[in-house]
Design a protein with these regions (language model features):
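Short aromatic loop motif centered on NTY/YTY
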Residues: 169, 194-237
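Sec/Tat signal peptide C-region and signal peptidase I cleavage site
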Residues: 22-26
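Bacterial N-terminal signal peptides that target proteins for export
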Residues: 1-11
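Short, surface-exposed basic-aromatic patches at helix termini and helix-loop junctions that form
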Residues: 89-90, 178-190, 212-213
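Conserved helix-turn-beta segment immediately C-terminal to the redox Cys motif
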Residues: 121-125, 186-194
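Short, thiol/selenol-centered motifs that function as redox-active sites or metal-ligating centers
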Residues: 101-112, 157-179
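Non-globular targeting/processing and membrane-anchoring segments
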Residues: 27-153, 233-364
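Bacterial N-terminal signal peptides
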Residues: 10-19
Length: 364
C-alpha cells in the first residue's frame, strides 16, 4: 500500500529534477552581450556563466592588453573623430553604408554615431562565436591571442590589412568577422540585444538563417543593439563580392537601395573604386549617398559631378603609398591646397600630419 505513494513521489522528484535541469540550461545560456564583453576584455554580467572564466590568467592578460590598446586609440583617434563629426556632420541620415569595411564597426560608429542602421560589407566571411563555456581545454589562451592579432593593424594604423585578415579571421576558435564585430560593439559602449544570421535573395529581401533565399544568397548577420541613450539600432554585415560581376549576381545593392539615401564611409579601400570593374558600386554610392566621407583610396575626384557635390577637404594629401602606384590624383592635390586642419590620422597614411579626409556633401 505504501509503494504507490513512494512511486508517485519518485516520479514527482524526477519531473522536478528535469525541470530544474531545463531551467539551469536556460540560466546558463551565454548572452551575446556577455560574449561580446568577454571577447572585448570587459567583465560580463555578474550572473553570466562566463564570469568564472575571467579568473583565467589568459583572459586577465587579454583584459589588460585591450584596455591599454583601446585607451590609447580613444585618446589618439576615436574621440577626435567624434568631435570632428559633431562639428562637420550637421544632419546625418539614419542609414550609413560602409563598403569594403571588413568588421570595422569601430570607425563606422566614430564617424556616424547617430545612425540607426549600419550596413557593412566585404569579402570576409561572417563566421561565428562559439559557446565560450564549451571551448576545448587549453584553447582559450590561443583563441584570445587570435583576437588580439586580428585587431592589431586596425588598432595601430586605423585599417585592416586584407591579406593578414584573411588568415587571422580563419584561424582558431573565433573565425570570421563576427568576433571582431562583438569586440567593437562592446568597446563602443553598445549593448547587444539580439544576433541572427540572415541571407539576401536576388531581390534584396532579407531572410532568416534557415529560410531559402534562392540560387544566389548573400550571407550576413543582423545585430540589434542599443547605445548609451538606450535607442535601438541595427547593424548588418554581409559577406559579398563588390565587383561588377559580384553585385550583378546578388541582391546586396537592391537591399541597400531600400535603405537609401544614406551616408557613406570609404577608407583604406585598396583604390578598388578607381578600377572599372567596381564601377557599379561606385555609381551606387554616388547616387545613394547624402554625404561621403573618404580618404583618397575612395571614389576618384573626377567621378564626382561638381554641380551636385560640395567638397570639404581636411588634412594633407601626400599621394598614395608605394603599394598603390599610379593612383596619384593631381585634382585631389589641387583641392587639398585649400584644406582645413585635422588632428587625427586615418587611412593608409595613418599619421595625422600626412592623412587626408574628404567630406563630400550632395547639393539638395
Amino acid at each position: 500500500m505504501k509503494a504507490l505513494p513512494l512511486a508517485k513521489m519518485a516520479a514527482a522528484a524526477a519531473i522536478m529534477l528535469l525541470a530544474a535541469a531545463e531551467t539551469g540550461r536556460a540560466t546558463d545560456a551565454v548572452s551575446a552581450d556577455d560574449a561580446a564583453r568577454f571577447l572585448a576584455g570587459m567583465p560580463p554580467s555578474v550572473q553570466s556563466p562566463l564570469t568564472p572564466l575571467t579568473k583565467d590568467p589568459a583572459w586577465q592578460h587579454h583584459e589588460k592588453f585591450l584596455d591599454a590598446a583601446f585607451g590609447q586609440l580613444e585618446k589618439r583617434q576615436t574621440s577626435k573623430i567624434a568631435a570632428w563629426a559633431a562639428v562637420n556632420l550637421a544632419a546625418p541620415r539614419p542609414t550609413m553604408f560602409y563598403m569594403f569595411s571588413g568588421p570595422d564597426f569601430l570607425y563606422a560608429n566614430a564617424f556616424y554615431s547617430k545612425a540607426t542602421t549600419y550596413v557593412l560589407s566585404a569579402l570576409e566571411p561572417v563566421g561565428q562565436v562559439p559557446d565560450l563555456t564549451r571551448l576545448p581545454r587549453g584553447s582559450l589562451a590561443p583563441g584570445l591571442s587570435d583576437v588580439e592579432r586580428s585587431l592589431g593593424s586596425i588598432l595601430s594604423f586605423s585599417f585592416f590589412i586584407t591579406k593578414k585578415m584573411k588568415t587571422d579571421l580563419r584561424a582558431g576558435e573565433f573565425d570570421g568577422t563576427l568576433p571582431i564585430l562583438y569586440v567593437f560593439l562592446a568597446r563602443s559602449g553598445k549593448t547587444i540585444r539580439d544576433v541572427s544570421p540572415v541571407t539576401l535573395d536576388d531581390t534584396g529581401a532579407v531572410h532568416s538563417g534557415n529560410e531559402n533565399a534562392g540560387r544566389n544568397p548573400t550571407p550576413g548577420v543582423r545585430i540589434h543593439f542599443a547605445g548609451g541613450d538606450g535607442a535601438e539600432r541595427t547593424l548588418y554585415y554581409f559577406s559579398t563580392d563588390l565587383s561588377n560581376s559580384g553585385v550583378r549576381n546578388s541582391g546586396f545593392l537592391k537591399f541597400c537601395a531600400r535603405l537609401a539615401p544614406g551616408n557613406s564611409l570609404i577608407k583604406s579601400a585598396s583604390y578598388l573604386l578607381h578600377a572599372g570593374n567596381f564601377s557599379t558600386v561606385r555609381e551606387f554610392i554616388l547616387a545613394n549617398s547624402a554625404t561621403i566621407i573618404q580618404d583618397d583610396s575612395g571614389i576618384p575626384l573626377a567621378d564626382f559631378d561638381p554641380r551636385k557635390w560640395r567638397f570639404f577637404p581636411f588634412g594633407r594629401y601626400a599621394g598614395p603609398i608605394d603599394k598603390f602606384p599610379g593612383r596619384y590624383q593631381p585634382a585631389y592635390a589641387e583641392l587639398f591646397r585649400r584644406s582645413q586642419p585635422m588632428d587625427f590620422g586615418i587611412g593608409y597614411r595613418w599619421r595625422s600630419f600626412e592623412s587626408n579626409l574628404l567630406l563630400a556633401v550632395k547639393v539638395p
